[in-house]
Each structure stands twice: as structure tokens, then as C-alpha cells.
């Protein structure tokens, strides 16, 4: 079962998509959640990584999917190329690792996205991030979807 904007335990933030298993006793168990962002000329593109609505940052802080160890993000590429956005995202991760003033988050260069596979107009990446709040890590799958004309 899929759900839009699943609620988060102990957070007012919501992810965009939740994937659940319905058990025989009607208990719903979340197994994966996804955050989605647009890459375009008019979006605040750095928020894929950090900022008030920062996708990766919310997973790192435990504002998204605190109860899960593996989740994902969708990037809707509406301008430029997937390769350009991949480079920019990794540049923003490096920037945060060298310049972050947020003491509740530790960024490292090891948190850059790594290429996994190309599936037609979708490129798949992976990253792993430290979560200070729970002293563990979260693994993220990243799907960059080419929507350019």
C-alpha cells in the first residue's frame, strides 16, 4: 500500500510518499518512505540536500523516517541534465561538510551520492548518512528522473 504524506513519529514534518505492509490484524507497518524534490531553474535546488526544507538533512535529523534505516528520494529533473544535478548535489554535500554551522548535524564528504545504475530516463544513486539524534545511519536510494522536454 502507498500513502501520501505519511505522519512522522515525534515530528511535524511529513515525507511525500510512504510504502506500507498491511498485516492480517489490520496493523499497518511502514517499510519505506520517500521525499521528492524538483530540480529546475525556479526551485531552491539546494534544498535537495539542506535548508529549511532540506531533504537529506531531514533524514539526517530524524525529522523524516526516524523509525527506518533505509529510505529514498525522488529528484524530478525539469531542467539541465541528471549528470549536472548529480555533480551539484555532491558539491552541496562537500560544502556542508566543510562549512556547516548547524551543530546538530555532522556532514562528511563520505555522504556524497554514488552512482548505482541507469534505468532509461531514470538514474539511481545511493548514499549513507549519520544521524546524530539516534547515533545510527540511514541509507538513501536516490532516483533522478529526467523530465526535460
Go through each PLM region and give its residues.
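"Short basic amphipathic alpha-helical interaction patches in structured regions
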Residues: 30-35, 46-53
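C-terminal tail/extension regions appended to the core domain(s) of diverse proteins
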Residues: 45-50, 62-70, 80-149
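A Trp-anchored, charged/polar loop motif used as the substrate-binding/catalytic surface
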Residues: 15-17, 49-62
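Short acidic/polar capping segments at secondary-structure boundaries
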Residues: 39, 78-81
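Conserved catalytic cores of phosphodiester-cleaving nucleases, focusing on short active-site segments
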Residues: 17, 32-40, 59
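Active-site metal-binding core of divalent-cation-utilizing nuclease and nuclease-like domains
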Residues: 1-30
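An N-terminal domain-start capping segment
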Residues: 21-23, 42-48
Amino acid at each position: 500500500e502507498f500513502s501520501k504524506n505519511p505522519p512522522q513519529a515525534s515530528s511535524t514534518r511529513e515525507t511525500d510518499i510512504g510504502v506500507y505492509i498491511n498485516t492480517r490484524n489490520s496493523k499497518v507497518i511502514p517499510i519505506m518512505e520517500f521525499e521528492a524534490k524538483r530540480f529546475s531553474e525556479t526551485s531552491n535546488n539546494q534544498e535537495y540536500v539542506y535548508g529549511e526544507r532540506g531533504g537529506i538533512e531531514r533524514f539526517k535529523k530524524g525529522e523524516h523516517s526516524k523509525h527506518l534505516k533505509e529510505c529514498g528520494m525522488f529528484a524530478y529533473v525539469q531542467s539541465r541534465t541528471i549528470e549536472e544535478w548529480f555533480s551539484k548535489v555532491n558539491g552541496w554535500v562537500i560544502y556542508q561538510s566543510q562549512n556547516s554551522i548547524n551543530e546538530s548535524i555532522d556532514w562528511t564528504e563520505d555522504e556524497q551520492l554514488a552512482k548505482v545504475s541507469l534505468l532509461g530516463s531514470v538514474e539511481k544513486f545511493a548514499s549513507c548518512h549519520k544521524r546524530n539524534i539516534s547515533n545510527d545511519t540511514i541509507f538513501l536510494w536516490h532516483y533522478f528522473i529526467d523530465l526535460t522536454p
